[in-house]
Amino acid sequence: MKVRNSLRALKKIPGAQIVRRRGRTFVINKNNPRMKARQG
């Protein structure tokens, strides 16, 4: 999982989902699990 300032590029990748957990924003991608990130 990467920690990024901006998730804008990651959320455009096919299969990406934006999830809010415990006040943090995550991008999870079941199609391409390498594209996981958290907004730092």
Swiss-Prot record:
Cited InterPro entries: Ribosomal_bL36 (IPR000473), Ribosomal_bL36_sp (IPR035977), Ribosomal_L36_bact (IPR047621)
Disulphide connectivity of cysteines: none
Superkingdom per UniProt: Bacteria
Single GO BP term: translation
GO molecular function: structural constituent of ribosome
The keyword Ribonucleoprotein is assigned to this record: yes
Pfam families documented for this protein: Ribosomal_L36
GO cellular component, one term: ribosome
Keywords (A to Z) from UniProt: Ribonucleoprotein, Ribosomal protein
Ribosomal protein among keywords: yes
Family to which this protein belongs: Belongs to the bacterial ribosomal protein bL36 family.
Protein name: Large ribosomal subunit protein bL36A
Organism: Paenarthrobacter aurescens (strain TC1)
Gene transcribed to yield this protein: rpmJ1
